[in-house]
Amino acid sequence: MMPLLDKLREQYGVGPLCSELHIAPSTYYHCQQQRHHPDKRSARAQRDDWLKKEIQRVYDENHKVYGVRKVWRQLLREGIRVARCTVARLMAVMGLAGVLRGKKVRTTVSRKAVAACDRVNRQFVAERPDQLWVADFTWVSTWQGFVYVAFIIDVFAGYIVGWQLSSSMETTFVLDALEQALWARRPSGTIHHSDKGSQYVSLAYTQRLKEAGLLASTGSTGDSYDNAMAESINGLYKAEVIHRKSWKNRAEVELATLTWVDWYNNRRLLERLGHTPRQKQKKLIMLPSETMIWQPEFTDKTLSRKPGAVQ
C-alpha cells in the first residue's frame, strides 16, 4: 500500500489519500521513516527482516517442501535460536507452506502366482542396515504418456538403496531397481517386502531374489497398510516433486527424481533420527547400535486442518 501512496501523494496529497484509505497520516510518515532509516526500526522488526531471509534460504535449499516444523528444526541445527511460533508467523506473512500429499492411486495389479508369505506383518522394524528392504512403484503423468518409478528402501534408516524409471510396468524395470540396490549394498539374508503386484511376484523377480540370497515377503492383496513404509515414500515423492508442476517427458522426470533422491538420502531432516539428515548419521546407518522403527511423517500442528501436509 505504501508504494501506492508514494505514487499518488504528489497528485492528491497525503491527507486526502489517508482519509480515503482510513489510515492515520502519522502511520504513513512512520512507515516512511522506517524505510529510509532502517536502523531506527525496533529490534524485533530488524530481527524479523533477518529471519525472513534465513527462512527463505532454508525453504529454497530444500526444494520448497518444508513446512513450519522442519524449517524451524533446520534453523536450530544451524545455530539460529528462534521460537517455532515466530517461524510460523513469518512463514504465514511470507506466504510459505509445506507441500500437501495427494490421494494414492492404485497401481498394483495382482497376479495369481504363488506369492511369498508375509514375514513383516506391518512391523517395519530393523536392528541393523539391510535387515529389511521394502519395495513399491508409483506412476507419473507426462505430456508424452505415463512414467513409472520404482523405489527400494532400507528400513533401518529409511535410505533409498535403489530406484528406476520406465515407460512401462514390465517386470524388467523393478528388476533394474533391485539390481541397483544389490550392487550398492551387497546384502545377505535381507528380507525383501513388497505388495502382491504382478511385477514383484513374477518368476523372474522371485528367482533373482533367491539368487541374491534375499528372503521374499509380500503383504496381502489390496491393503496398503501391509506395505505402509514404501507407500509413505511414494507419497513424499509425489508431494515433494511430482504434484508441484506438469512434466514434459521421461527425461525431465528422471532428472528431478535423481536430484530428489540425493537430497532425500543425504540432507532431508528425518524426525526419527532426531531431526537430522541421514548424512549426519553415518555411524548410525553403518553400525547396528539400536533398533530403528519406521514411523510416518507427522503433520505440523499449524497445518492440522490440512491432512497430509508434508513437513
Residue spans for each PLM region:
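N-terminal amphipathic/hydrophobic targeting modules at extreme N-termini
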Residues: 286-287, 295
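Charged DNA-binding/catalytic regions of mobile-element recombinases
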Residues: 1-281
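N-terminal, intrinsically disordered charge-dense segments
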Residues: 279-283, 306-311
